[in-house]
Amino acid sequence: MNQAYIDAARTLQQCTFGGSQRDINDLVQSGSIENWVAQQTLIPSSSWLTHFEQDELNVPDLGQGLYYASSWTRMTVEGQDILRQRIAYTLSQLFVVSVKDPAFSAASKRRYMCQYFDGLLDNAFANFRDVIRFVSTSPIMGEYLTFVNNVSNELTAPDENYARELLQLFTLGPVKLRNNGEVRLDAEGNEVASYTQEDIEELARVFTGWKFIDIRGNDKYSQPMEPRGEHDMGEKRILGKKFPAGVSAVDELEAVIELLMNQNTLYTFVTKFFINKLVTSNPRAGYVRRVRRAFKRSDGDMQTLVIAILTDKDALRSGNTVGKLRDPLSVFTHAMRALQVKRRDGVMMWPKQFNWYNRTLPLSAPSVFYYYQPDDAPNHPDFNGLVAPEFNVYQWHDIYQYGIQFRELIARFEEETKDWYMDEALFTRYLAFDDEGVVDYLNEHLFAYQMSEQARQCYLDYLAQCPSRQSKWRKEIKNLVMNALLSPEFITQG
């Protein structure tokens, strides 16, 4: 196989929810990752909300919870803006909101969560300051981190939730980082904090006076918040910078955004976060430093960040400590895209079998700290000094539900009465006794050409024991695909 196709398959595994053979061809034919990214930015953005409303219209009275899941599947499996979707998903893992919060427990609010994600889609290739601005004025975030209707006066201090998480989780992290991602230490060897409690208290005063738009009911979540309340107009000092008195809420927010974008640690923090989510959980210092330099020189351009991550010499490096464990949502969506799973004509929405049994449905984390933290790792000597946070979403219950999803998927292969089907090329090769072709198909479509020789021989040995390619072929091919989808080599990304 041409090395360009191998590299393209690995790149798509990193920066999309899984590439089909057509996607791989598009990347190779573009001539470079830079050209391909530029082409991707021109593809119109998907809309989770639009798909949600289509499902609600096409199959009414099923409940917003089901539309929420089915419309996500429609968007990610059928959408063409594959890079934009993955970058927006990564942003959603950074700027966390969740339907699990009591404020959003009502199913009627699911559509507004879709709309929040659409905002991240719109800003996926923008400047990082635009992302901060969108999130900071989002009514979903205002409700989730409780700073909507925030007030400040002599008797009541403003709510500090958003101010704290904006610094701690979204932009700077709790400690300052060197340009290579390592923690900065003072002369005594202690970690240097990125901010103080006083910074949080002063920043909370900035986020006063923001309210929902003047509409009754849930439609208040449909538009950005407005500075219609009593904004704290007093002098403030944040991260060593003086904010003069008498500044409006909008202008003060802009000043805060610029202050954050001038913090060196922000570029390192965001760079490392994106490398962790897209390429490897344990990047080398040089990788972080090089990407961070490009991101900083671009003044926070997201497109530059993505290109720098994907074109760096470490992006396709091999070794025992490179790569990452992929989360179940990414793995399952990759399987559906790679196997070219499609709805049959006349099927109006993805069936309930894709209601995401596992607990990693987007915008559904148990808290603002997401499902895991970047430095989480299994308690095992093999991980000494390494991190692997995604292991936290592979508990026994999750693995069981993950298996159920794949069982539901492959149970419908090539059955005319079912609602979806997959690419016929795999079955054609199988029925023709083209065992090498079958394994090549799995290697190309599922493993990004990274299937080990041991796994390859295992699949060939299985096929050699399947002499009856007619009477039991459905069961035999389903067993083969199920084995591949549940294999560690498919779930991990090297």
Language-model region placement:
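Flexible, low-complexity segments enriched for small/polar residues
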Residues: N2-Q3, A9-T16, L57, F95, ...
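Tryptophan-centered motif/residue detector
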Residues: S71-R74, Y162, W210, A365, ...
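N-terminal mature-domain "stem" immediately C-terminal to a signal peptide or N-terminal signal-anchor/transmembrane
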Residues: M1-S46
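Aromatic-acidic/polar surface patches that form glycan- and anion
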Residues: Q80, A193, W473
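Active-site substrate-binding loop specific to GH73 endo-beta-N-acetylglucosaminidase modules
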Residues: I24-Q29, A38-I43, L49-E56, D61, ...
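Amphipathic interfacial helices
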Residues: Y67-Y68, E78-R86
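Short, contiguous, well-structured surface segments enriched in hydrophobic/aromatic residues
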Residues: D81-R84, F95-D101
